[in-house]
Structures are given as C-alpha cells and as structure tokens.
Amino acid sequence: MAVLCAGAGFCCACMDYGPLHEEPFAQSQRGVFITCEGNFGWDNASLSFYDPAARTVENEIFIRANGMKLGDVAQSMTLHKGRGYVVVNNSGAVYVIDPATFRVTGVIEGVVSPRNIHFPNDTTAYITDLYLSLIHI
C-alpha cells in the first residue's frame, strides 16, 4: 500500500502543461539559463531561467514560450550578440532564441549530433559534433 501511495504522489508532482501552447513572459533582465538534457531517446530536454534578483525559477520556458518541445538531449547553451543558442544533441538542431522572451528566432539544422557552439568572432561559429570527426563552420 505504501508503494502505491508513494507512486501516486510521484505522478502528481510531474509537470503537465496539457496541449502544447504558448505563454507570454515578462521581459527578462538578468539571470541564468539552465539546460536539462533529459533522458536520451525520451524527447524531454528542458530549459529553465533563474532570476537571482527575484529569487524565482521559471521551468520549461522553451515549451511554454514556443508551444513545442525542445527535443532530445539539450547538450549546451551559449549567449552571443543578444541571442541564445541551445544545442540539442540527439535532435540534431541548434535553436536560436531571444533570451528576453525565450522565443525561437531561428534554427540551425543539418548537423548530425551537435555538442557545443563557439563564436571566435562576430561572423563565425564552430559547432562540434559527437559522431563526426569534423567541426561545422
């Protein structure tokens, strides 16, 4: 009986946003982005935002701001020139987001298994790949 009760409590604690829909957010000022890679193969990566001034955390901001899942294995995130680049490894994509609204402004596709993105200057980006012995430029 105790196992059943504990299991029921665990299921109730899960985040459930129902059908995918978009939510508006107040413009963020300063804070910390937190990527959670999720479970490999489960398509449950997430992105959260911590506001240290307000001492609040907004979880699942990607799905809530865009009405779509982030994907499978959020590997890393980099901020560059007013944009956020979220590298989603097993989905083979790099999402470009507006860091103030968390909304997607673009996507970089055509990479097999991206890991990290680095900007050596304002016009070049390097994307490492887990399975290929090359760096995308």
Annotate each predicted stretch with a short phrase.
Residues 1, 6-32:
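Bacterial Sec-dependent N-terminal signal peptides
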Residues 23-52:
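An edge-strand/N-cap motif at the start of beta-rich repeat modules
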Residues 34-42, 79, 84-90, 126-131:
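Conserved beta-strand positions in repeat-built beta-propeller and related beta-rich domains
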Residues 52-53, 98-102:
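Short loop/turn segments that connect beta-strands within beta-propeller blades
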Residues 56-69, 103-108:
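A short beta-strand motif characteristic of beta-propeller blades
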Residues 67-80, 111-125:
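Beta-rich, blade/repeat-based domains predominating
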Residues 93, 99, 112:
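Active-site-adjacent structural elements in enzyme catalytic domains
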Residues 135-137:
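Conserved small/polar residues in nucleotide/adenosyl-binding loops
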